[in-house]
Swiss-Prot record:
It holds the Pfam family Amidohydro_1. This is Dihydroorotase. The gene is pyrC. Its EC number is 3.5.2.3. The modification N6-carboxylysine is found at residue 98. Binds 2 Zn(2+) ions per subunit.
Amino acid sequence: MTQLTITRPDDWHVHLRDGEVLKDTVRDISRYNGRALIMPNTIPPVTDTEMALAYRERIMAEQPSEQFQPLMALYLTDNTTPDEIRKAKESGAVVAAKLYPAGATTNSDSGVTSAQKIYHVLEAMQEVGMLLLVHGEVTAHDVDIFDREKEFLDTVLAPIVNDFPNLKIVLEHITTADAATFVKNANENVAATITAHHLLYNRNHMLVGGIKPHFYCLPILKRNTHQLALIEAATSGSKKFFLGTDSAPHAKGAKESACGCAGSYTAHAAVELYAEVFDLEGKIENLEAFASHNGPDFYGMPRNADTITLVKEEWNVAETMPFGSDIVVPIRGGETIAWAVK
C-alpha cells in the first residue's frame, strides 16, 4: 500500500512548553491533528482551572489551524482538592488530571509524593468522570532507572486500579512489555498511550557508538525486547492503545550538554513516523484505529469528522527547527522519513 486515507488523528499527550516557543510548537502540533492533550508540567505547573484556561488562551492566540482544539489537563499535587477537580470538570476545557510522581521527569518537582495523599482527589475524579493520566515511574533512588516503570505498576498503579475500578486511567508513554501486559489484562477503564520514538528506537540507539542525547527521554528507552512488545501492542488493533507522542522539545544546547534534558521532539512528523512502524509490521490498516479512533473512544469524545491522506513518499527532515529564539533538533533531523502527509 502506497497511499492511506484515515480519520484526522489526535495526539493524546504532548508538551508545548510556554512563552515565545508556543508559536513553533503550536504550528507543528496543529498541522494535521484535530485535538491534542496538552501536558501541564510547565513553569510554573498548571495546578488549577484558572491556570489551565489561561494557558489554553495563550495556545489559541498563536492561531493554530482552524480544525485544532487543545485539551487541557491539571497537574496534581499533594494539595489538589476535590473542589478543584469539580471546578475543572465544569469548565469543559479540562478533560484530565495528571499524576507526576515528584521528581520523575521534567518539571515534576511539585508532583505527588505519595498516591495515598490524593486518594480523596481520585475519589472525586471517579465521581465526576475526569480521567487520570499517569507518568508510571517510581522515583526511589534504590530502584534502577530501567526498572522504575515495572516497580510503579506493582506498587502504585495496581492498588489505584483496584481501589478505583470506575476511574478511567491512561498509563502514559508506556515503555515495557510489563506495562503492555498490565494494560491488556486490566479492566476496560485502563488504557495506554505509546510514543513514536519508543516504537522506533531502543536503548542501543541512544548508547551504542556514542551517546545520542536527542534519544534521551523519560521514561528512558528500554532494551529491544520491550520495544518489540510495544510494537505488537500498538499495531495489534487493540482499543486499549492509542497515539500519544510525548513530544517534548528542549533547545539544542539544553540537550547537548553535560547534564542534558529529557525529551524527544516528534510533533513535526508524528503520524508519519507511526506510519513507518505500522507499515514495517505489515499492519498499516490498523494505523487509523490507533491514531484516530481509540483515543476519542476512550475519552468519550466524537471521532474527528474529516480525514488526512498519507503517501509512501520519502522526504528529508530539517536538521534543526525554530524553537522561539533558539533551535530544536527533531527526531530524524537531517535524515529521511518514508511516509508523508499529502
